[in-house]
UniProtKB/Swiss-Prot annotation:
GO terms for molecular function: guanyl-nucleotide exchange factor activity. Constitutively expressed in brain, intestine and testis. Low constitutive expression, if any, in heart, lung, lymph nodes and thymus. Up-regulated in heart, kidney, liver, lymph nodes, spleen and thymus at day 20 after infection with Trypanosoma cruzi. Not detected in muscle. The gene is Rasgef1b. This is Ras-GEF domain-containing family member 1B. It is found in: Early endosome; Late endosome; Midbody.
């Protein structure tokens, strides 16, 4: 079977490969081109353009873009059914002509399309209807006269089943972490001795902590399917009368789990800073996290960097003026400048481009690491989706929009496939993922207990929190 190129090779700087389509295709029914670039088409014509025949195989860029965006218009199992039907029709035509050479030409192309679908969008096949169609078509290919494809079909199915099994295992771990999560204050009330344990007793080296954070980031990134970026913004297609499949398509559990990790890390940072009783210990903890954040920046782990900065900027932490007075903040000021939201995060975007360029020319796994500030990536995709229509006035699919969407998502796909080069420290990872953190109210209470309220509003809140959380007046 032909080898598929890496995602980074799929799109040029303009958003898509400009040399995919020959001028002879300009007159293809239902597809509209400009300067040989596919701009729009009817949904039916785009589906036909996806399916290979004896003389044609779609470019990988088109396959990825259409499989990614088609779920805005139809459920993947509906697309799979149409693709299977067209593939079977092509096979029948070849068989009807009695030309075995034609069969030999088309079978590997169909198998390659199915392989690309299962490799890039494996989560589509959690749907039994998808898996049934895939097995039916794969069986048809493997049981024909051409037995040479049986091994390739088996490899494709085994690889898909492994990926789905790994996803199920990952989801079980997430569910277990979620079910055992408790509030830090509750733990301290029942086990006061646990207050002695903090992040610095578990991992005294900020560089090691930054590396372990990168492990968590890359693992969670790896489980996000590219389709989740589209499914997060699925809305009812006005030309679609099936109301039920809209809600079915909105599956974004791994994306949501990653956003929850960002929030957890921010709260963990704030908890670790607010928990120490002594001012010098709080100041030391702030400086520790500044060093962790700086190393995250050097690694290219912008998501952990931003989570740490967010935690340090939470009100219960930022109000600790006496503590901050003891902190050397020069390094923190530089990091805040890098992640400054002004001018649409211009400084961060510049740093991200630099990291992405470094990744392309990398000589080591460490240099390949690019972990974007995830919430901003989601926001960019959201505004791209909101800023352009999915369908043109004539009912055609606005494919120009989806080239750009696919460009952004394919870049993410390249980054998420990087293997973490750092040694795993299970003790540190366990602490980061499972140690209880303070709720927002508990953070404020700890902050007021460390440095008393400065005005009447804070005094009233302190009294209220002591009463509700500690049962004290």
């Amino acid at each position: 079977m032909p080898q598929t190129p890496p995602f980074s090779a799929m799109f040029d700087s303009s958003g898509y490969n400009r040399n995919l389509y020959q001028s002879a295709e300009d007159s293809c029914g239902g597809l509209y081109y400009h300067d040989n670039n596919l701009l729009s088409g009817s949904l039916e014509a785009l589906i036909q353009h996806l399916v290979p025949n004896v003389d044609y195989y779609p470019d990988r860029t088109y396959i990825f873009t259409f499989l990614l965006s088609s779920r805005l218009f139809m459920h993947p199992y509906e697309l799979m059914a149409k693709v299977c039907h067209l593939c079977v029709e092509h096979q029948r035509l070849s068989e009807g002509d009695g030309d075995k050479n034609q069969m030999r030409k088309i079978a590997p192309k169909i198998l390659q399309l199915l392989t690309e679908w299962t490799e890039t969008f494996p989560y589509d096949f959690r749907d039994e209807r998808m898996m049934r169609n895939l097995k039916d078509l794969a069986h048809r290919m493997a049981s024909g006269e051409e037995q040479t494809y049986r091994k390739n079909v088996q490899q494709m199915m085994q690889c898909l089943i492994r990926k789905l099994a790994a996803l199920s295992q990952y989801e079980e771990v997430l569910a277990k972490l979620s079910s055992t999560a408790t509030d830090r204050l509750t733990v301290l009330k029942t086990k006061p001795q646990s207050i002695q344990r903090d992040i610095m007793t578990v991992c005294s080296d900020p560089y090691t902590l930054a590396q372990q954070l990168t492990h968590i980031e890359l693992e969670r990134l790896n489980y996000i399917g590219p389709e989740e970026f589209v499914q997060a913004f699925v809305q009812k297609d006005p030309l679609d009368n099936d109301k039920s499949c809209y809600s079915e398509r909105k599956k974004t559990r791994n994306l949501e789990a990653y956003v929850e990790w960002f929030n957890r890390l921010s709260y963990l940072v704030a908890t670790e800073i607010c928990m120490p009783v002594k001012k010098k210990h709080r100041a030391r903890m702030i400086e520790y996290f500044i060093d962790v954040a700086r190393e995250c920046f050097n690694i290219g782990n912008f998501n952990s960097l931003m989570a740490i900065i967010s935690g340090m900027n939470m009100s219960p932490v930022s109000r600790l003026k006496k503590t901050w007075a003891k902190v050397k903040t020069a390094k923190f000021d530089i990091l805040e400048h890098q992640m400054d939201p002004s001018s649409n995060f211009y400084n961060y975007r510049t740093a991200l481009r630099g990291a992405a360029q470094r990744s392309l020319t990398a000589h080591s796994s460490r240099e390949k690491i690019v972990i974007p500030f995830f919430s901003l990536l989601i926001k960019d995709i959201y505004f791209l989706n909101e800023g352009c229509v999915n369908r043109l006035p004539n009912g055609h699919v606005n494919f120009e929009k989806f080239w750009e969407l696919a460009k952004q998502v394919s870049e993410f796909m390249t980054w998420k496939q990087v293997e973490c080069p750092f040694e795993r420290d299970r003790k540190v990872l366990q602490y980061l993922l499972s140690v209880p953190v303070f709720s927002e109210d508990a953070l404020y209470l700890a902050s007021y207990e460390s440095e008393g309220p400065e005005n009447n509003i804070e005094k009233d809140r302190w009294k209220s929190l002591r009463s509700s959380l500690l049962g004290r007046v």
